[in-house]
Design a protein with these regions (language model features):
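Substrate-binding/gating loop at the entrance of the active-site cleft, primarily
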Residues: 1-14
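PLP-dependent enzyme catalytic core of the Aspartate aminotransferase-like
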Residues: 209, 214, 218-228, 232-268
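Conserved core segment of the aminotransferase class I/II
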Residues: 93-173, 180-184, 263
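Helix C-cap/helix->beta junction micro-motif
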Residues: 12, 67-68, 189, 223, ...
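Conserved glycine-rich beta-strand-loop-beta hairpin in the small C-terminal domain of fold type I
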Residues: 153, 157, 172-183, 193-206, ...
Length: 268
């Protein structure tokens, strides 16, 4: 799970229930009818696992939310990386407008990390306990937030221009090819992973039953390659590791060759 979801709710004093996300379900958690939740965080394509929900899986979450009077907070920060016939938005699912809020960011789509610009979609028909959620959110924003700076707004507007969309598609295609290169190497090595398509992330199972930090140390010391230990994303990440395609082509190819060499020697 993306750590911000956890930490922000801990600071708010909320009780947190973790959905089961593991190899058995392809790291695409599904609702548990025995669990009652008021707010549900979903991220698809997922950070860190790279898995992306299909329409049937998202429908299961929407049905659960409607049945339990819950609200889904849907993080679609990586929707631009989807290449297969998968939903890019929770609102592609019937009934979602009555139970979901969608958040998206230009951080990964257009390289806005640090510049900070994104958007939130709240259907005007979304209500809970007699309160209109859109009206409440609008009041909150008008009180606590003065908006993104003008230069950043201009840059964000350029993202949606014809030329901006052309450049973004080229940029995303570049990272998608990096992800394919990494995934191809893992296929060659026979290592289980999720992601590698529809996402810039590759979530791999550490070889030889190694722990996440043990594998981190191996790659750092033997290959001079750095990734993210899965344990940093919660207990379901133990024994897994995240690689990213957000690098240049030359470094990606070099890193893959180094990883292949280390893991080939490890299996001897």
């Amino acid at each position: 799970v993306y750590p911000v979801y956890v930490d922000s709710n801990i600071m708010a004093g909320r009780e947190i229930v973790y959905a089961t996300s593991n190899e058995a379900n392809g790291f695409a958690a599904l609702p548990d009818e025995n669990v009652k939740a008021d707010i549900i965080y979903l991220c698809s394509p997922n950070n860190p696992t790279g898995s992306a929900y299909n329409a049937e899986q998202l429908k299961a979450w929407v049905d659960y939310a409607l049945k339990n009077d819950a609200i889904i907070l849907y993080d679609s920060a990586y929707e631009a990386f989807i290449t297969e016939d998968l939903p890019r938005s929770i609102f592609a699912i019937e009934g979602a407008r009555k139970c979901a809020i969608e958040m998206c960011s230009l951080s990964k789509t257009a390289g806005f990390t640090g510049t900070r610009c994104g958007y939130t979609i709240i259907p005007k028909e979304l209500e809970r306990d007699g309160h209109n959620i859109y009206a409440t959110w609008y009041r909150r924003q008008a009180t606590k937030f003065n908006g993104v700076s003008w230069p950043v707004q201009c840059a964000a507007a350029a993202v949606f221009s014809e030329e901006g969309q052309k450049q973004i598609k080229e940029n995303i295609s570049y990272y998608q090819e990096n992800a394919r290169i990494i995934a191809s190497a893992l296929d060659e090595l026979g290592i289980y992973y999720t992601g590698g398509k529809n996402s810039p992330y590759i979530w791999l199972k550490c070889p030889n039953n190694m722990g996440s930090w043990e594998f981190f140390d191996l790659l750092l010391n033997e290959a001079n390659v750095v990734g993210t230990p899965g344990e940093g994303f919660g207990e379901n990440g133990a024994g897994y590791f995240r690689l990213t395609s957000f690098g240049d082509r030359e470094n990606t190819i070099e890193a893959v060759e180094r990883i292949k060499k280390v893991l080939t020697n490890l299996s001897k």
